[in-house]
């Protein structure tokens, strides 16, 4: 399964509610992900631009997006961003594949301005 990192902010109303009645939100997120075949790897309260960070596994992007939308539909979340995370093994494979593709790719403008293709690919 693919690993995703999501970050977001709580609304002021959500912060007021959780301050009045603290609760472990990781349980709700874990249940939401499990309902679609995903898994919560970690949930963290964070400092800075975002209030929380979630690391999760999901079968595919559509499935992950459905969980984000379901959580956001409650109105307590905002400014959500999600990133796909690749393992070290997947990264090595991606760079290997990129190396093969780069040999076949013609850079924009490579045939113009007298720049040989070999040099343009190194720019």
Label each region the model flagged.
Residues 1-123:
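A compositional/biophysical signature of low hydrophobicity enriched in polar/charged and small residues
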């Amino acid at each position: 399964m693919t690993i995703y990192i999501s970050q977001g902010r709580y609304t002021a109303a959500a912060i007021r509610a959780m301050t009045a009645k603290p609760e472990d939100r990781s349980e709700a997120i874990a249940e939401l992900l499990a309902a679609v075949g995903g898994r919560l790897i970690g949930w963290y309260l964070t400092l800075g631009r975002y209030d929380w960070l979630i690391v999760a596994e999901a079968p595919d992007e559509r499935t992950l997006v459905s969980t984000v939308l379901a959580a956001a539909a409650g109105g307590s979340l905002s400014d959500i961003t999600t990133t796909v995370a690749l393992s070290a093994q997947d990264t090595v494979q991606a760079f290997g594949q990129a190396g093969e593709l780069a040999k076949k790719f013609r850079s924009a403008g490579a045939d113009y301005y007298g720049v040989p293709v070999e040099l343009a690919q190194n720019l």
